[in-house]
Regions:
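The alpha-helix within a helix-turn-helix
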Residues: 33, 82-83, 94
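Basic, low-complexity segments
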Residues: 36-42
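Short hydrophobic/aromatic patch on the recognition helix
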Residues: 43, 92-97
Length: 131
């Protein structure tokens, strides 16, 4: 008989793989569970036990990480990023992103696209900078 811990670790690995393949498709957690051949409650218990987070939180973390990467590394308009990430429109994407990060996608992009520390120049001045 297989070790229960190893089985749970394998299910979590398979879940993460499915998330990687389908996070842009906005699957419901029950669909991931069905694909894994288990029920929603078992998937939820395994994720909480192994990661401290629910399956939905793990999916949203992956989607948020991809959104941040695209905002940081592409000049694409929000509408395009929203479409690429499976949102029906830029407004829904903005709402999701703001709920997850406490800032709008535009504000996030403005912060991460500044040259390093540009906004901190005034704060760094010390006695040596005096005339």
């Amino acid at each position: 008989k297989r070790d229960k811990g190893a089985e749970q670790t394998d299910l979590l690995r398979r879940f993460r793989h499915l998330v990687e393949l389908h996070y842009r498709d906005h699957w419901q957690v029950v669909k991931y569970a069905n694909e894994l051949g288990i029920d929603y409650d078992r998937l939820h218990r395994i994720c909480k036990r192994e990661t401290g987070r629910s399956p939905a939180e793990l999916v949203h973390e992956r989607l948020t990480a991809e959104a941040k990467a695209r905002l940081e590394n592409s000049g694409f308009p929000l509408k395009r990023i929203a479409q690429d990430l499976g949102f029906s429109d830029a407004s829904r994407f903005s709402h999701f992103f703001k709920r997850r990060t406490d800032m709008s996608p535009g504000a996030y992009r403005a912060i991460v696209s500044r040259p390093d520390g540009e906004d901190l120049v005034e704060l760094r001045r010390g006695f040596a900078d005096w005339p």
